[in-house]
Design a protein with these regions (language model features):
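Binuclear metal-dependent hydrolase catalytic cores
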Residues: 1-204, 209-212
């Protein structure tokens, strides 16, 4: 597998737009040891040609620009993208807002839990993702999911989603919904990501609130 870290900053990126903490001043002053960073996201490929995004950050347009492997391929016609799927680990703004950058009627798959797909469905702004081109695929926890291209061909990557400590996205918190704002297991997940042969794997846990010893 080929793995690209598209962004590694927390919500809002680094530096955050309204932050005057000394750490945030460093990139503005050109400190080479504190470069600006975009919000967290990965790109993964089994063949180096077609790619899967793990979360779609608000900085996605810039992340695509900065990574030529995600550029439209010049021999594939007027419209093309190597991005064939997006996997969402929760409904945080930092992880779903970038979907709006992918609205140009380009075919790809969205993989997420039923809970997160419900959030997308309840917010009409995501209807800019034309369902004739963009398929929303529900994932069940603790079961392997083979990632597919829009035409149904395997991408050579299998994921295993499982619940981790966390909560519902900040913008969905409901103080009247009970403990932890009414959060359920499908609100925050982690992923074991494996190649098709099961020879290599890694874990992606961008919103895990705590880890046991």
């Amino acid at each position: 597998m080929k793995i690209r870290v598209l962004g590694s900053a927390a919500g809002g990126g680094y530096p955050q737009w309204n932050c005057n903490h000394p750490n945030s001043l460093r990139p503005r002053r050109g400190d080479p040891e504190a470069p600006p960073r975009t919000q967290s996201s990965l790109a993964v490929s089994a063949d180096g040609d077609d790619w899967v995004l793990f979360n779609a950050s608000p900085d996605l347009r810039q992340q695509i620009f900065d990574n030529p492997v995600l550029h439209p391929r010049p021999d594939r016609g007027l419209r093309d993208s190597p991005i064939k799927a997006v996997v969402l680990t929760n409904a945080d703004v930092d992880h779903v807002a970038g979907l709006l950058n992918l609205r140009e009627s380009q075919a790809f798959q969205i993989y997420a839990t039923e809970r997160v797909l419900g959030v997308l469905g309840a917010n009409s702004i995501f209807n800019v993702l034309n369902p004739d081109f963009v398929t929303r695929v529900p994932m069940r926890l603790d079961r392997d999911v083979e990632l597919l291209r829009p035409n149904g061909d395997p991408l050579g990557i299998t994921i295993h989603p499982f619940a981790v400590p966390g909560k519902v996205a900040l913008w969905l918190e409901d103080e009247g919904a009970g403990e932890n704002f009414g959060s359920v297991d499908e609100d925050t997940i982690a992923l074991e990501v494996k190649d098709a042969a099961g020879r290599t794997c890694f874990f992606y846990m961008p919103a895990c609130a705590r880890i046991t010893e």
